[in-house]
Amino acid sequence: MVIGAQLYTVRDFAKDLDGFSETLKKVADIGYKTVQVSGTCEYEALWLKEELQKSGLSCVLTHIPPAALIENTEKVCADHDVFSCKNIGLGAMPGGGKVTDEIYEKFVSDFMPVAKKIDELGFKFFYHNHAFEFSKSSDGKLFIDKITEAFPAELLNFTLDTFWVHFAGADVCEWIEKLSGRVECVHLKDMAATFNNRNRMAPIGYGNMNFEKIISKSELAGSKYLLVEQDDCYEEDPFACLKKSYDYLRALGLE
């Protein structure tokens, strides 16, 4: 398995092309060889290809806006082909951070054709979870279960986010096992406690989640890319947080 950096962690430094270029260099200087492109400014596919090459990085996953996926599926795939990325991601189900029966049904209706087209063109479609997918629909089933059942494994993969699974009160390792063969990419994100009984995101190894076990289960489930993400670094420098996570994972023998 390969360690990667989810660029959403350092999105505030990639709001324009110059900043994006410098961000890629800084991430590479930490030691990362792969990235997920998400939360950055807009870019042309050829520009990204050239910037990745300059920094010695490869892009293994993206997050693409829902409208672009629905309205321009073929162009999205063509762009990914330019910068040699086979994995195309959706960051969340459209719905403003919540899900209802109606929102879920529209999601399936809108994205089943997208998933089929992406597969037809030789790419893979990935869905990134938050916590809301672990709420229950009117029939008593978890929405995450409904998603896994509605989309065949060959049409939908999952970017399992360890923090949000844990936040939802679910067992991370159990879900990695449950999605075995569909979790080529995993978002590694730690959870720490605070003195006011609130949880917060932390660099890997600086919280309380059992990442040695999570990583072991990920390997058994066929995961290829372990992508470090920290949505909020609070008072810390996001690049310093990425380095802390990188150093911890390297100490476990990962590259």
Regions found by a protein language model. Give the residues of each.
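N-terminal pre-domain/capping segments
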Residues: 1-87, 250, 254-255
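Hydrophobic faces of well-ordered beta-strands that scaffold small-molecule active sites
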Residues: 3-7, 35-37, 59-64, 88-90, ...
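Conserved, mostly hydrophobic/aromatic
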Residues: 5, 27, 35, 52, ...
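Acidic-and-aromatic substrate-binding clefts and catalytic sites of carbohydrate-active enzymes
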Residues: 11-17, 34-47, 64-73, 95-99, ...
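Alpha-helix-loop-beta-strand connector modules within alpha/beta enzyme cores
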Residues: 48-64, 111-118, 145-153, 211-214
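Short, electropositive alpha-helical surface patch
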Residues: 53, 61, 65, 140-152, ...
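Glycine/small-residue-rich loop that forms an oxyanion/phosphate-binding "nest" at active or ligand-binding sites
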Residues: 71-110
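Acidic/histidine-rich catalytic cores of soluble enzymes
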Residues: 120-208
